[in-house]
Amino acid sequence: MKNFHVVLEAAWLVRDVKTADDAIGVAISEAGKRLNPKLDFVEVDVGTTSCPVCGEPFSSVFIAANTALVGLIFEMKVFDAESAEHAERIAKSVIGKSLRDVPLTVVEVTEFERSVEKGEQQQKGKANK
């Protein structure tokens, strides 16, 4: 079994905002309320979009008529998945249950090695003695 870091993207609608910073704050707050405290292992951040002209990255926020569309990024680690596709399905299922009616798109899936925690090292050291 392998471990994966899965990054998902969602479009979050925020009403009655005047600035991009307000929209970002409200979107992250609303998403966080839906995810926490059950899913405190999911990281929430604002996505970035590249400018089509100059290529510079900027926050994924679009405002029109005091309504904003904010691109949010959700990151989580999936342990003991059979494959990258399996990790994608697990992440979409876990996050999707809390964020009903919010479409999720997979941005990136990377495999990682599970590091041994200090407590586990001490336990192993005691077991070997």
Swiss-Prot record:
Domain of life, per lineage: Archaea
Pfam hit, one: DUF555
Protein name: UPF0212 protein MM_2357
Cross-referenced InterPro entries: UPF0212
Recorded family membership: Belongs to the UPF0212 family.
